[in-house]
């Protein structure tokens, strides 16, 4: 019987875990380690090296070794080795194949299914790429799960029965996420884990801390020897490895010595490095990186609508959270010390293994509810972003809304799908466009076009549009090439905050234009339909106001539209007054003709009158 595993596919290291007897177990690799470096190398004789062996030979095989490829997932990045171009999916697949083989060796069985984790702020392109990597590795990807959610799943199941809020602070090798989750258990020990809010930075991680040490060491070498090693690939690889080791040592020691003999050779002779780096200096070099963790933290608290004091537990995920400065920052932000009972390197894979067990039916005591990080919508008249699914909505989810045509006898509509937080589509990210054709000829406003957004449990978006009248339907799936980059997400959120007022004013102006156009259309139609019943002077006045609105709409002056629209709103009431007056006059004439007959019947009717009171009882449910 094939087995399902949970995999934490990390930037720096990866971990695989499996359920054994209903409990998660981390699987050690062939080298005996519980974490596997996410490093892939191609030897000159054609052998593919993965993990520890690839990392060990990196210095002597720099051009044929690839690390931290997770940062390129969902992009068009490639690396060429021996004339063959490799995509991030292909490189990641090599790491996944290694984890799969190690798991099969441990289990003595084949592994066909996997739950793979990704940063919570991964966009559609990055999620698709991760899923493709799993498929390239020969696995059926049961689910793409957010890393902080998996961590909370592993941690939260050990909690008591009361509902608790868990904040997961996930600083990995290349990405950063903060998520707030609500964990609860019922009397039958069934756990529900629901994500309340998530935020992050896909370009912030331990690699950036390492790079600061590398940059500092390059400066030290240049100032003392005059040698510029910034273009020396072998020297840079040695410095990177030394920097990573120094970072780890400074998590437990207040200082460390970095000593690299024969780092390079110049015309003046060999270049040696022997530098002492204190924790204080290291923290000073990286203080701006640490400061970047504050905003996502505060965004999550704000999005969830809670106070910091409401947080019950803080869980640290990712090896980079071992740095003392990070622990201090989290304690400062959360107002409480993080939990010490979680292994930050393994907790995500454990959660993924639990979710794999849930999906395979091996565990039935937990429900996981995740969210989508950005709002999704379509463009409507005036370039307005009409949101169908708001950010931080629980997934999987499906939302539908009915729209109509903007012109008479419109044969088709163009459905443009956007992602972002701004009021106008021009400020958001266009995910794709498709046409719904074959709409039956009809006056504008009559066709009913139902647009449906469907986000699956992997966070991947599907959109469809259906003409309710003809039954014609068209759909699309948002695929990797059209998804957002992290920079786009950050820009959208920042722009939305900075331009909220301007967006509101533009939205009001667009709505006013739409209302003015609709009113002018309706009033003009009313004049034509009841032409004989409307006095000529009223008809002329109102038609002039309709023409003024149409003229204003052709220009770009929103104030002119507002003025013309207000005048039309005022004058159109005269049509109603005229029609009502005519109706009353016709009624009065009819009443006069029947008055004589009414008098004869009055005496008899008076005898039948019951002296009673009509009571309108709001509490009476009878109609």
From Swiss-Prot:
Region (Disordered) residue ranges read: 497-521, 585-623
Q: What segments bear the compositional bias annotation Acidic residues? A: 605-623
GO molecular function terms listed in the Swiss-Prot or TrEMBL record: ATP binding; ATP-dependent protein folding chaperone; unfolded protein binding
User: Which terms are listed as keywords in the entry?
Assistant: ATP-binding, Chaperone, Nucleotide-binding, Phosphoprotein, Stress response
Output the PROSITE patterns linked to this UniProt entry. Answer: HSP70_1, HSP70_2, HSP70_3
Q: CDD domains under this entry?
A: ASKHA_NBD_HSP70_DnaK-like
> In what ranges is there compositional bias, type Basic and acidic residues?
497-515
One Pfam match: HSP70
Name of protein: Chaperone protein DnaK
């Amino acid at each position: 019987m094939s087995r399902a595993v949970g995999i934490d596919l990390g930037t720096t290291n990866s971990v695989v875990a499996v359920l054994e007897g209903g409990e998660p177990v981390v699987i050690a690799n062939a080298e005996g380690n519980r974490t596997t470096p996410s490093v892939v190398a191609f030897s000159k004789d054609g052998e593919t090296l993965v993990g520890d062996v690839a990392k060990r030979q990196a210095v002597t095989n720099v051009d044929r070794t690839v690390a931290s490829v997770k940062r390129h997932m969902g992009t068009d990045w490639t690396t060429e080795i021996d004339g063959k171009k490799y995509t991030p999916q292909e490189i990641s697949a090599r790491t996944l194949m290694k984890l799969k083989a190690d798991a099969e060796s441990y289990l003595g069985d084949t592994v066909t299914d996997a739950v793979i984790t990704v940063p919570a702020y991964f966009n559609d392109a990055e999620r698709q790429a991760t899923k493709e990597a799993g498929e390239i590795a020969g696995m059926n990807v049961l689910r793409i799960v957010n890393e902080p959610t998996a961590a909370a799943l592993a941690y939260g199941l050990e909690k008591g029965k009361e509902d608790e809020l868990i904040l997961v602070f996930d600083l990995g090798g290349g990405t950063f996420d903060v998520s707030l989750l609500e964990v609860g258990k019922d009397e039958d020990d069934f756990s529900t884990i629901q994500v309340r809010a998530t935020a992050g930075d896909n370009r912030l991680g331990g690699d950036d801390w390492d790079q600061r040490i590398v940059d500092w060491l390059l400066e030290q070498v240049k100032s003392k020897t005059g040698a510029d090693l910034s273009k020396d690939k072998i020297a840079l690889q040695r410095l990177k490895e030394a920097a990573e080791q120094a970072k780890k040592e400074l998590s437990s020691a207040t200082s460390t010595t970095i000593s690299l003999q024969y780092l390079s050779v110049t015309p003046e002779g060999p270049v040696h490095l022997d530098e002492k780096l204190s924790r204080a200096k290291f923290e000073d070099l990286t203080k701006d990186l640490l400061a970047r963790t504050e905003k996502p933290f505060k965004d999550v608290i704000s999005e969830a609508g809670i106070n910091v004091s409401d947080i019950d537990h803080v869980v640290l995920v990712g090896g980079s959270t071992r740095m003392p400065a990070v622990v201090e920052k989290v304690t400062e932000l959360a107002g409480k010390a993080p939990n010490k009972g979680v292994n930050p390197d393994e907790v995500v894979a454990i959660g993924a293994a639990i979710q794999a067990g849930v999906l395979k039916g091996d565990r039935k005591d937990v429900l996981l509810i995740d969210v989508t990080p950005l709002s999704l919508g379509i463009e409507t008249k005036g370039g307005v972003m009409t949101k169908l699914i708001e950010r931080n909505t629980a997934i999987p989810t499906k939302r539908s809304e009915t729209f109509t045509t903007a012109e008479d006898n419109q044969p088709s509509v163009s459905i443009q799908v956007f992602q972002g937080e701004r009021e106008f589509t021009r400020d958001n990210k266009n995910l794709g466009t498709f046409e719904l054709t074959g709409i039956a000829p009809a006056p504008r406003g009559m066709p009913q076009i139902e647009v449906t957004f469907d986000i699956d449990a992997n966070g991947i978006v599907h959109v469809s549009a259906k003409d309710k009248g003809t039954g014609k339907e068209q759909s699309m799936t948002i695929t990797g090439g059209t998804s957002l980059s992290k920079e786009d997400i950050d820009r959208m959120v920042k722009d939305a905050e900075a331009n909220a007022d301007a967006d509101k004013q533009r939205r009001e102006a667009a709505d006013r234009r739409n209302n003015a156009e609709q009113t002018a259309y309706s009033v003009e139609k009313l004049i034509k339909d009841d032409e004989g019943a409307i006095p000529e002077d009223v008809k002329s006045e109102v038609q002039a106001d309709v023409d003024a609105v149409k003229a204003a709409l052709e220009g770009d002056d929103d104030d002119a539209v507002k003025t013309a629209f207000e005048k039309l709103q005022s004058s159109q009431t005269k049509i109603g007054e005229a029609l009502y007056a005519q109706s009353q006059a016709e009624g009065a004439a009819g009443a006069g003709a029947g008055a004589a007959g009414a008098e004869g019947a009055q005496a008899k009717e008076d005898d039948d009158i019951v002296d009673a009171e009509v009571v309108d009882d709001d509490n009476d449910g009878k109609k």
